[in-house]
């Protein structure tokens, strides 16, 4: 699992394509990077999106990024058994736009590995906004 902090100026849209919604727009950005590198596109894991969002909200409330641990992660692990995960990963970050966050993830080796790992076939995206910044949790599994 990896974490990332980028707070540079926003580039492009701060909330993503309004037609997709910000969570699905972030997944579209991730899938574009995957497909350009001959990986299969990820499906949106709606059943974990609320958990990912609650983690993003908790990070925004505390003012720093961290990986999910403790009871929520235990709950996530229980869900993983129900969905038959073999492997899971998580990218967390804070920044000015979804595009800049995806660019930062791809520029960081551990985050890029999570995005491009071939075994992953699903991802959940949780987004919170606070103080003109976007806090994000992306959970990958396959």
What role is predicted for each listed range?
Residues 1-142:
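Functional surface patches built around histidine and acidic residues
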């Amino acid at each position: 699992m990896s974490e990332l902090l980028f707070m540079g100026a926003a580039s492009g849209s701060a909330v993503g394509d309004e037609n997709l919604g910000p969570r699905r727009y972030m997944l579209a950005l991730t899938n574009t990077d995957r497909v350009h590198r001959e990986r299969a596109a990820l499906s949106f894991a709606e059943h974990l999106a609320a958990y990912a969002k609650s983690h993003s909200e908790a990070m925004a409330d505390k003012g720093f990024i961290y990986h999910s641990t403790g009871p929520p992660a235990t709950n996530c692990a229980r869900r993983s058994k129900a969905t038959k995960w073999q492997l899971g990963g998580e990218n967390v970050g804070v920044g000015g736009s979804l595009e800049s966050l995806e660019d930062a993830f791809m520029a960081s080796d551990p985050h890029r590995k999570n995005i491009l790992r071939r075994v992953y076939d699903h991802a959940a995206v949780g987004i919170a906004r606070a103080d003109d910044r976007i806090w994000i949790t992306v959970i990958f599994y396959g």
